[in-house]
Amino acid sequence: NPQGKRVVLFGAGGAARAVAVELALAGAESFHIVNRSVERGQALVELLRHKTLAKAELVAWLGPYRIPADVDIVVNATSIGLFPDVDATLDLDLDTLRPELVVADGIHNPPLTHLLRTAQSRGCRTVDGLGMLVNQGVIGVEYWTGRTPNAQVMRESLLALKL
């Protein structure tokens, strides 16, 4: 439940915008938008400030990012770590991943990214990118067929592929 939570969001593209707006509408209190492009990052900050009640600030990503002590949720909405470049890692100070954090990665292939493996090893609760992929698929199938597919079956089928 994102109600009242403070979020660090890596990225400012389409996936980041969707995640940020949904978290804000669900009650997230504030966002640190961490992005290399100041212009794109600031556009997301302005969107959040003008369309939601959440506070938002842009943080320039100039080196290993340290997760602030007051943050509750960390989300990677970049393509860093996406197949085939699965060994790529966020420029993140991994020592700042604390057990009480929820760490989510929008990447669906591989489902268990370097970020998520590291977060799990540090006791964090993790959320993989398959959920976003599956829910996009559910919406697409509903749109085209008028029928609602079983999201759990879709997720299990994707996992069975062992991508």
Where on the chain are the PLM-derived regions?
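Conserved S-adenosyl-L-methionine
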Residues: 25-30, 121-125
